[in-house]
Amino acid sequence: MGDDQEDDFPRRLSESMEDLSLDLGALQGSEYLQDLGLGAPSHSQPGETPDSRPTGEEPGRDSLFSSLAGSQDLSRRRSWERSRSCSESWRRLSLDASAVDEEPCLPRTLASLALNLPGGGLKTWTQGCLSGGGTPAESPGKECDSPKKRGRSRSVPVSFYEIRSPEISPGLEVPTPPVQGLEPPVLECMEKDHVEPDHVLIVQQVLQELRQYHGARQRACMSASPGGAHSNLTWFEFLSESEDGAGKNEKSDKSTSVKRRLSCLRSRVTRQKEKGKSPAHLKDKGQDARERRECVNGHQLLQGTFSGPSSCPLCGKPFLSSASLKEHPRGTLLSDGSPALSRNVGMTVSQKGGPQPTPSPAGPGTQLGPITGEMDEADSAFLKFKQTADDSLSLTSPNTESIFVEDPYTASLRSEIESDGHEFEAESWSLAVDAAYAKKQKREVVKRQDVLYELMQTEVHHVRTLKIMLKVYSRALQEELQFSSKAIGRLFPCADDLLETHSHFLARLKERRQESLEEGSDRNYVIQKIGDLLVQQFSGENGERMKEKYGVFCSGHNEAVSHYKLLLQQNKKFQNLIKKIGNFSIVRRLGVQECILLVTQRITKYPVLVERIIQNTEAGTEDYEDLTQALNLIKDIISQVDAKVSECEKGQRLREIAGKMDLKSSSKLKNGLTFRKEDMLQRQLHLEGMLCWKTTSGRLKDILAILLTDVLLLLQEKDQKYVFASVDSKPPVISLQKLIVREVANEEKAMFLISASLQGPEMYEIYTSSKEDRNAWMAHIQRAVESCPDEEEGPFSLPEEERKVVEARATRLRDFQERLSMKDQLIAQSLLEKQQIYLEMAEMGGLEDLPQPRGLFRGGDPSETLQGELILKSAMSEIEGIQSLICRQLGSANGQAEDGGSSTGPPRRAETFAGYDCTNSPTKNGSFKKKVSSTDPRPRDWRGPPNSPDLKLSDSDIPGSSEESPQVVEAPGTESDPRLPTVLESELVQRIQTLSQLLLNLQAVIAHQDSYVETQRAAIQEREKQFRLQSTRGNLLLEQERQRNFEKQREERAALEKLQSQLRHEQQRWERERQWQHQELERAGARLQEREGEARQLRERLEQERAELERQRQAYQHDLERLREAQRAVERERERLELLRRLKKQNTAPGALPPDTLAEAQPPSHPPSFNGEGLEGPRVSMLPSGVGPEYAERPEVARRDSAPTENRLAKSDVPIQLLSATNQFQRQAAVQQQIPTKLAASTKGGKDKGGKSRGSQRWESSASFDLKQQLLLNKLMGKDESTSRNRRSLSPILPGRHSPAPPPDPGFPAPSPPPADSPSEGFSLKAGGTALLPGPPAPSPLPATPLSAKEDASKEDVIFF
């Protein structure tokens, strides 16, 4: 069994070599491997074994490895017993690209340690291992066939929760005595080295395997002495002995399968990585991995970490625990051993529970607290390791950078920024204050406070951005990459000045917020005034500072971004440092470009916020005015910043053009000088663009025109380079000093450039793309010509001596002007002080109503200020007022003073008022009012107020005027002159004071006028002298062009004034028309209102008439109903009478009707209608008259033409509205039917008697119908005349004529046949076998008018039916 294992071990060792071939060339011969016992095989003879080392060092080494490796060996017991998700494994075993790739890593297995051994050393070392270590079935070999294979497959620790507490407690305390020669890692090393979790596993596994190798010969001794075994027991042996033997075979199989999976994954990942890398790159990386080591404070170490609180046995400093690395996965940069803040990293062992105390370096062992191991699958860890191993960087290399962490400075910066923004964490003011407090405010107040809150909040963010730029990025670049201030200034120009300015502004905003807090609350506030702070921030010194600094910062924006991108591409240290800083929580994804952009845009945010504040501020308030002023100031700052940015962009564009210029390209000027591309950079760019140059042949040539400070360049592009254009042998460099710009006639896009140089005038015809471009170019060129320095080139320029003389004269002239201006100001100040003295004197005299002194003259245009005419007119009017006042008072005096009396003044003239200069009342010394009263009132004698003899007008020097000077007269007055009233004296003093002020103003104006006139005269003389010295033909042309431009401008101004006048006239006319239209609208409105009133009245009248008509209609309907009732009653009475009459007649005839027949013969009573139905009513009512003995004799034959006749009668009825006596008569006559006389004569034979009786009945029926109709017409029409006429027209029909009987009513039932012996009253006509059925008796239509004799003679006799 042991031989099989010995034979199997080299085979598995070889497999492990092929699986993970890691290079340990960097560790060969090192002190570290010598201390571990691995130095001898690489330098000794093949036959020498590692066991030849002294055994005295092994116990110390055992204790050391128990201290360093024991904390993690326990957690590797059951790495295959728990499964983790892929995502969790990836997260927990995350590797940093900056800490793995270029660091020489320790091997994972013992087999990998022997990869670099010499030829025979591998075999000898392996045999020594087998012979000295015993059988693998001992303590470490209980779980698998080989401890080497177990160490490879169980490289991931497991949670301590899976191990029972009794099994852990015996081995928690492991003694760690100091060991000589071994230098484990300490805190100072860990502070500068970023530790990855996978490296932790590598170091722990190697230490475990080395401890197994060196302690193989000690196991027998340790097993012999229980106490020693307990004191020197290794973690590897403890874990092997404490494990049960139930699942050993199963775990061994799992170990083998895990190893095979790792080998497969490794080969796959390696192939994928090596596909994208060149062999040279892989070779360089292998060399870098051998060369990169670092020794810190005497500790030669590799990367690793240790779980739980541990300390270095050499230096005594505590190890950096895994819990301290969890806050920053990128590692820590700490100096002087300061601890790092806690942050979780992808470690496999995390600190649980409370904080563990750090043990003393002199302690016997290390206390392990309650920790939990979180393990991942080995294949996922290996895959992640191989993916990041090829591209990672080593932090221990001198070519790499250190990693930032939140040291005390960063922590203080974080707290500072958080304290700044603590008050403005809410999104708006409505959410920052209490909800109840916000609801009590008005809507406008809430909106205003929201905008103010947004202003302060954005200011906090801006200050935070500036602090990040300066205190994070700039500080890191200075300390880590040793960037100079100039280099940092290229990235963040003037950032420190901007931070200072905005920090001060933010502090003032916070103060204003604190002042506006409600009493008893630290949240509720309403800021009433903010405009004053904005005005102070954007005006004065602060405003100028913001203009300057923002101009510099915004101008360098593009350059800073370009420089940052260049550094990011070329400097790998810079790239890594920026990446590490980006992981700071304080940065919050604010990169360098984002910071620069935010600072650049901040100045443009203020106008929007201030405008919104103004919209929610009440107009007319003080804050509204301040906000408006602040808005104007901000816009002015932005415009100036834009101008600086534009100037900077133009300079950048000029440098680009100069960079594209051909090195050999140059141009010769007319004066012989050469213009090269270096001369371009000494000037400023005004405008550049593509134009067309027209040649003499008429072709247009594309050129690039560049307008500089004093020249205009015409360039051409050739082979992607710019050269000076050469067209018609004209110089492409045009001087602006004598350039004239003219328009081309009939060409909207062309312009002439005329160079009036004495060496040779030239004219260029330039075309643009549009008329607007032409006008823009002409305007820019003209402004450049006006601002061009007045220097002549070549021999026509003034000599240096003459130029110096001219400059000296101009300097002296300016000095004279300044001195004169200073003296004028002194004169004005003296006169103002003199006026103040007068006022004080007047106040001392008791006058308190005097006006306050004003400035002697206002500033502005000297042509307006130095106009003394208005002042002189005002003074004359005041003098006339004083004269009239005094004359009005003295004219009421009763007498004049006597001539006697002493007087200190000059003799009075004859024209003066007698007695005025000498009043008999005593004078009051020092009284201003009394002295005024003694002054001569005449204008030509009045020179000023009393007690001011030094103040005189300019004409006081004229001979003879001395007697008119004011004098103070003190003489005893007479009793006859009354004293001046107090009111008069007060008014007089006020007028004299006003007159004095006007005269002082006049004097100051005259002084200023003199200075101004003399200065202008000297300037004109100087210009004339210079003009004579420089009078050349070119200057004359240029002066003529300027004069032409001035005239053109004057004409344009006149045209503009004319247009303005026309506009005013049009506006006035429009106002008149609008006023007239308004009046017309008012009149039309008045008329409309009148018409509305009339229409309203008419509507009311119509309503009344309609109501009256409705009332009359109802009365008429009522009367009509009564008439119908009366008609029906009359009809019933008539029918009753008719029935009685027939009954009476029938009673006389044989065979009376039975009673039931009489009852049936009673007709229904219904009123006749007006539409012709009255003809049928009597017919129906007369039906019983035909029922009797005669009716049975009639045959049952009816005439076929009876129905059409009735229909024709019915169709010819006249409507009721056209019913009258005349048309009724005509209608009845029109429907009469004529029968030949022969047919009628055949029926007259033996029936005269019956015909007479039936004719009489028909006549009575017809008469009764006509009577009813006539009564109805009389009721409706109410006309007696028509009644009489209708009665005369109803003449009786001749008895010999009979009307034919109408056909029987189809709705009436047929009567029963009478007896045969009854007499027949009907008649029958038999002609051609046709029988005429006798109809029931019916009334005949109205008879027609009898025919005349001639008609009877010409026609046959007919019978009318």
From Swiss-Prot:
The keyword Metal-binding applies. The keyword Cytoplasm applies. It comes from Homo sapiens (Human). Pfam families: PH_16 (PF17838), RhoGEF (PF00621). Acts as a guanine nucleotide exchange factor (GEF) for RhoA GTPases. Its activation induces formation of actin stress fibers. Also acts as a GEF for RAC1, inducing production of reactive oxygen species (ROS). Does not act as a GEF for CDC42. The G protein beta-gamma (Gbetagamma) subunits of heterotrimeric G proteins act as activators, explaining the integrated effects of LPA and other G-protein coupled receptor agonists on actin stress fiber formation, cell shape change and ROS production. Required for EPB41L4B-mediated regulation of the circumferential actomyosin belt in epithelial cells. Residues 1300-1317, 1334-1344 have a biased composition (Pro residues). Residues 1038-1148 form a coiled coil. Interacts with SEPT9; the interaction may inhibit GEF activity. Interacts with Gbetagamma subunits GNB1 and GNG2. Interacts with EPB41L4B. Interacts with PATJ (via C-terminus). Residues 447-644 form the DH domain. The modification Phosphothreonine is found at T912. Residues 50-61, 74-88, 245-256, 271-292, 1191-1211, 1349-1361 have a biased composition (Basic and acidic residues). This is Rho guanine nucleotide exchange factor 18. InterPro entries: ARHGEF18_PH, DBL_dom_sf, DH_dom, PH-like_dom_sf, PH_16, PH_domain, Rho_GEF18, Znf_C2H2_type. It is found in: Cytoplasm; Cytoplasm, Cytoskeleton; Cell membrane; Apical cell membrane. PANTHER family: RHO_RAC GUANINE NUCLEOTIDE EXCHANGE FACTOR 18 (PTHR47440:SF1), RIKEN CDNA A430078G23 GENE (PTHR47440). Residues 64-73, 1254-1264 have a biased composition (Polar residues).
